[in-house]
Design a protein with these regions (language model features):
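N-terminal accessory beta-strand-rich subdomains and adjacent acidic, glycine-rich linkers
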Residues: 24-207
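Aromatic-lined carbohydrate-binding/catalytic grooves of carbohydrate-active enzymes
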Residues: 225-388
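Alpha-helix-loop-beta-strand connector modules within alpha/beta enzyme cores
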Residues: 292-299, 389-409
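Glycan-recognition surfaces
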Residues: 317-362, 396-503, 519-530
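Carbohydrate-binding surface patches
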Residues: 483-486, 491, 530-586, 590, ...
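C-terminal beta-strand-rich structural cap/linker in extracellular carbohydrate-active enzymes
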Residues: 605-646, 666, 675-693
Length: 693
């Protein structure tokens, strides 16, 4: 009879399954290769997730079989109702796990085998689910939730595989030639009666275990100051086709537009390379004949104050070229492997490379970096030795050096375990696949992925919902509101001549500062375990805003014409969702006021739901504001996140004192002696205001 693993695994024996270190290594990475059913030493013991011990949520292998690089385990799951498997999509001939890029997607299922069906109703703008994934959320039959996630050890990485029969396998491997050794971390899992706490509890445990992560909670990190302001990025406007003249002309056009863009992000298209491998940290001399000097001279304290630059974690898309112009002391910290130069092999050499890399950008005058292609760094090392340790060291060295040099960092294509679990200082990571102008299905998928992934990513970083076009006639204003409630960076990619001010100005104050929520938006409970592109139902998200409000956006993301019109709602109980974000939801309020941002109307919510009709690809934004001592504070009505535009300094039964952060129309609800009114107060100058009943 097999012994069942509970929380600490004391594993004794296994069944050999066609793998040894002397055999050809199966982990050399190339485009189109998958790791489904990879050869592994099959352990007899079952990882049983039916039993939960909150004090020790990390499962570990204590006795690793000798001379094995890869182990596999059967995973026993509790009875469940439905779930989410987090993996990338699997496109034949394309890159596969662990190169998740920005494609970590939430795949909904009633039974795990649903994910293996060729007719799986997934996400219309993406391929079918990859069987190899990194995390799993289950709604259990007893009403609780279980979250399980793969983790990395000092030189090991685990992952899940969904099998054709609906069973689940856990693999753990060095992804290379060396053997697994020591106490081996396998996975982390937690159970909770709250779908929100199951994520936060898991990350509390993960952060506390330094052997498997280098993390801090999002709230404990410093947010880079440029990201508090409106930005502009070259990518969706130009893609690779950038040069010095175009950027200088666009800076002129931005300044002439009257829109207070405060930073410019220069995306891909500037890198000196050969066959997509980096040859120099000096930009392409044909496109940028003066280097960065002329562009840097355009920075001004009250206009475009910050300039950021795109780069790849591994040098360029396919690594670093042997034909490079680096100084000798830098060349010696690079080693040749599988057709590319890579930083390493020691931790010290990797740190030296990233010190040179980041310092060079700092000396050019850049204020922050967008570091892309992060999840492809691991595949570049795969099949060698010390694969996990070296790839992880790249992420950590980037964190160390940007922090040391006080440079901002935007992480992109950073959705595998090594990337996600090692954002020690950085506070921003892309949450989704690229946004594309005029593509309705991609926009719907983008919103669904961004909000759902924030349940994971949002524990340690602010989610970057990508750039957007204010001139997008399909969803420009809708996208603007989603950027506002995301809490992450907000940056345009229109041609400056096409800026739509009506979609942009509600995001910001007169200086370009963004009105941000107190925590990033995430799905409401009924929306977490459904696919809103296929469900026939509305999709809702929420975020705490201002001192005491909760903002809710209701969407119709359905792709079928049969669900062109759906019904949504807001209700009193929604306000209590503030507590799930770690913010107070004081129940001492008299009532909850619902402010409909589009209609600029308000009503007191009663015991029943407030129904909303959503026709086509649309959204509806509400602010739920508590009525206390006869007052409800909505904020400046012209701004998407109205409650974030004011600070409540004092409130009595007859007086309200506020600090108003921008000009516009201040909306206040007053209830005195049975008389209720929604007041409009013109604000000509930001600052302190006293209001009496």
């Amino acid at each position: 009879m097999k012994r069942i693993i509970h929380i600490c695994l004391w594993l004794l024996t296994g069944i050999f399954a066609e793998v040894s270190l002397s055999a050809q290594n199966p982990f050399i990475y190339h485009k189109g290769k998958t790791y489904k059913d990879v050869a592994a030493y099959r352990m007899e013991e079952i990882i049983d997730l039916n039993t939960h011990t909150p004090s020790t949520p990390i499962l570990c292998e204590q006795q690793v079989p000798e001379h094995q690089s890869t182990l596999s385990y059967k995973v026993a799951l509790p009875l469940y109702v439905r779930g989410i498997f987090f993996s990338r999509d699997s496109r034949p001939g394309d890159y596969q796990w662990p190169n998740n890029t920005n494609r970590l997607l939430p795949w909904m299922f009633n039974r795990l085998e649903d994910l293996t069906r060729s007719d799986y109703a997934g996400i219309p703008s993406n391929a079918l689910p990859s069987a190899s994934g990194d995390a799993l959320l289950l709604e259990l039959a007893d009403g609780e939730y279980l979250f399980a996630k793969a983790i990395a050890g000092s030189n090991s990485l685990s992952w899940f595989q969904v099998n054709q029969d609906g069973t689940l396998t856990l693999y753990v491997s060095t992804l290379g030639e060396d053997a697994l050794t020591g106490r081996l971390p396998l996975l982390i899992f937690r159970k909770s009666s709250s779908v929100y706490h199951v994520f936060s509890d898991a990350y509390d445990s993960l952060i506390a275990k330094k052997a498997v992560s280098a993390l801090r909670k999002r709230a404990d990190k410093e947010y880079f100051n440029a990201f508090d302001y409106l930005g502009w990025c070259t990518w969706e406007h130009y893609h690779y086709d950038i040069d010095e003249t175009k950027i200088l002309n666009d800076i002129d056009a931005i300044e002439a537009s009257g829109i207070p863009v405060r930073y410019v992000l220069i995306d891909d298209g500037h890198i000196a390379n050969k066959n997509r491998q980096l040859t120099s940290l000096v930009p392409d001399k044909k496109r940028f004949p003066n280097g960065w000097s002329r562009i840097m001279k355009r920075k001004q304290a009250d206009k475009i104050r910050w300039i950021g630059l795109w780069y790849s974690l591994s040098g360029y898309w396919m690594g670093i070229s042997a034909e490079n112009d680096f100084p000798p002391e830098i060349r010696q910290v690079l080693h040749s492997y599988n057709g590319s130069l890579l930083p390493g092999t020691s931790t010290e050499k990797i740190e030296t490379w990233y010190e040179y890399y980041v310092r060079t950008m700092k000396e050019y005058g850049f204020d922050f970096l967008k570091i892309d292609n992060q999840s492809f760094t691991l595949p570049l090392y795969m099949g060698g030795t010390q694969v996990i340790r070296q790839a992880k060291d790249c992420n950590l060295a980037l964190e160390h050096q940007t922090h040391r040099m006080q440079m901002g960092l935007m992480n992109c294509m950073a959705q595998n375990v090594l990337n996600i679990d090692h954002t020690l200082y950085s506070s921003v990571t892309r949450a989704s696949i690229d946004y594309k102008k005029y593509d309705e299905n991609m926009a719907k998928s983008h919103l669904f992925q961004s909000y759902t992934n924030t349940l994971i990513l949002g524990q340690t970083v602010w989610p970057d919902h990508d750039m957007f076009h204010s001139c997008d006639t399909v969803c420009g204003s809708l996208m603007a509101r989603s950027k506002a409630i995301s809490g992450g960076p907000v940056y345009l990619s229109d041609s400056p001549s096409e800026f739509i001010a009506d979609n942009i100005r509600p995001l910001i104050d007169e200086t370009g500062k963004i009105f941000r929520p107190a925590a990033p938006a995430i799905p409401t409970p009924e929306s977490i375990l459904t696919n809103p592109l296929q469900s026939g139902k509305a999709y809702r998200v929420f975020a705490p805003t201002g001192d005491e409000a909760l903002s809710v956006i209701c969407y119709n993301l359905n792709t079928s014409p049969a669900y062109r019109e759906v019904e949504s709602f807001v209700k009193q109980e929604d306000y209590l969702l503030r507590e799930s974000t770690g913010k107070s939801a004081d129940s001492s309020s008299d009532n909850i006021l619902a402010f409909n941002w589009e209609k600029q109307s308000a009503e007191v919510l009663n015991a029943s739901e407030r129904k909303i009709k959503l026709s086509g690809f649309t959204d509806s934004l509400f602010h739920l504001c508590p009525i206390r001592k006869g007052w409800a504070v909505i904020g400046i009505q012209e701004k998407y996140l109205s409650p974030a535009t004011v600070q409540i300094l004092k409130r009595t039964t007859d007086k309200l004192i506020l600090d108003v952060h921008c000009t516009g129309t201040l909306r206040i609800w007053a209830d005195s002696h049975g008389k209720q009114e929604l007041r409009s107060i013109p604000i000509k100058k930001a600052g302190r205001i006293e209001i009496k009943k």
